Design a protein with these regions (language model features):
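Helix-to-loop junctions at the C-terminal end of transmembrane segments
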Residues: 58-71, 154, 259-272, 355-356
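Pair of pore-lining "gating" transmembrane helices in MFS-fold secondary transporters
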Residues: 2-29, 35, 103, 206-222, ...
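Helix-breaking motifs and short loop linkers at transmembrane-helix boundaries and internal kinks
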Residues: 38, 70, 91-96, 239, ...
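Interfacial helix-cap and linker-helix signal at transmembrane-aqueous boundaries
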Residues: 33-34, 65-66, 152-157, 234-235, ...
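Intracellular juxtamembrane helix-capping segments at the cytosolic ends
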Residues: 111-125, 312-325
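Short amphipathic helix-loop junctions that connect adjacent transmembrane helices
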Residues: 28-42, 228-244
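Conserved MFS/SLC helix-loop-helix module at the cytosolic interface between two early adjacent transmembrane helices
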Residues: 57-96
Length: 400
């Protein structure tokens, strides 16, 4: 059993890294694909919304399927779909084909995202201690690997279609080879259906899950703000050189990855409530410092603190959603991930119009407020069951 669980954990790491790698390969090729298709920033912005809509649709489908068929079936299928779709933007020849390609890529990403997080919850249940944050850190590392490879291939003049095709083949191979190491479907889910209680997908989503989803929306909006506006903040507000301004996002993402590598150990020691409460508070302080600082070094430090504070928060929400009901883990994770993803997409849409009313740096007080709300609502992570544990993770059960 221990070897099976250990192999499943390694496989989950692989799928998270693969997801980050595939999305990262698309991101680094966005300028080249947009130039090849002949579209400007405005049209590209609308097309990227299709990526998000496709992901949201995939998440809502993958959640019930994961509960019905098990993550062992849905994760490889989602990974294969995401891998096959990553080449499509490189083959697009006009706006319509690029839009269709992004819709399919988003759909595959959504299917993989929810199913692999549901499997991560299953692995975490088997270990009886927090392991979710490390999986999310591996996703970030996959994106870093994609950035390094993509930069190298672009520098050598390779066509996006060629590089993305190679990434697709690699993803398909990895998805197939790793599938056997995943855990089988939980026995309890089949028992519940046989007893006539109905499928998990047909149940009413508890209020606690919607609260977790609302917190995910707010905190992932904060992450989206950093992704889209941190560099512009240093460049346009503090007049930093382009190379220096780029360090803002680098500081944020590096601190977030490092924080997630440490978050599981901290969660095991202090509990998920403390991680969400103090992490959100630290993030609020960091972003406030970045927003109000007239000095570039302090602003960079603020963005780094913002990333470190946020790093452990989202994994706690995903973990709590998955552990709330083992028979409906996929559906519950899809609710939290779906609204969270919409929040990340809403970041640019919310901040942009606000800049017509106040300076860019003052618009960051909105995500600061969201962090404060998350800190105040951290108690929602307390296990409502009769036997809560300090880690907020149920002890090993027959699901593994």
């Amino acid at each position: 059993m221990e070897r099976t669980l250990r192999n499943a954990r390694v496989a989950t790491f692989v799928y998270f890294a693969l997801n980050g790698f595939l999305l990262g390969m698309w991101v680094v090729h966005i300028p080249a694909v947009a130039h090849a298709v002949g579209i400007g920033h405005a049209v590209l912005g609308w097309l990227l919304l299709l990526l998000g809509l496709g992901a949201f649709a995939g998440m809502q489908l993958a959640g019930p399927l994961t509960d019905r068929l098990g993550a062992r079936t849905v994760v490889p299928l989602g990974a294969a779909l995401c891998s096959a779709a990553v080449v499509l933007p490189g083959l697009a020849f006009d706006t319509w084909t690029l839009g269709a390609a992004l819709l399919l890529l988003g759909f595959g990403n959504g299917c993989l995202d929810v199913s692999m997080n549901a499997h991560a919850v299953q692995v975490e249940s088997g270990y009886g201690r927090p392991v979710m944050s490390a999986f999310h850190a591996t996703f970030s590392l996959g994106g870093v690997l994609a950035a390094l490879i993509g930069a190298r291939t672009l520098d050598r003049g390779m066509a996006p279609a060629v590089t993305l095709a190679a990434a697709a083949v690699l993803g398909l191979v990895v998805a197939g080879v790793t599938a056997r190491a995943l855990l089988p479907a939980a026995a309890r889910a089949a028992t519940a259906e046989d007893a006539g209680t109905g499928t998990p997908a047909g149940r009413r989503t508890p209020r606690r899950i919607w609260i977790l989803a609302a917190l995910a929306l707010m905190l992932m909006l904060c992450e989206g703000v950093a992704n889209d506006w941190s560099v512009l903040h240093l460049r346009d507000v503090l007049d930093a050189p382009a190379a220096t301004a780029a360090l803002a996002y680098g500081a944020f993402s590096t601190a977030m990855t490092a924080g997630r590598l440490l978050a599981d150990r901290l969660t095991g020691r202090f509990g998920p409530v403390a991680i969400l409460r103090h992490g959100s508070a630290i993030a609020a302080l960091g972003l406030t410092a970045a927003a109000l600082s007239p000095w570039i070094p302090l602003a960079l430090a603020g963005w780094a603190v913002f990333g470190a504070g946020l790093s452990g928060c989202i994994p706690q929400l995903f973990s709590a959603a998955g552990h709330a009901d083992s028979d409906a883990a996929g559906v519950n994770v899809s609710r939290v991930a779906g609204l969270g993803y919409l929040g990340m997409l809403a970041g640019p849409a919310v901040i942009g119009p606000l800049t017509h009313l106040v300076p860019l740096n003052l618009t960051f007080l909105l995500p600061v407020a969201f962090c404060v709300v998350a800190a105040g609502a951290a108690g929602i992570l307390r296990d409502p069951g009769p036997e809560p544990t300090r880690q907020g993770v149920r002890p090993r059960t027959e699901t593994v």
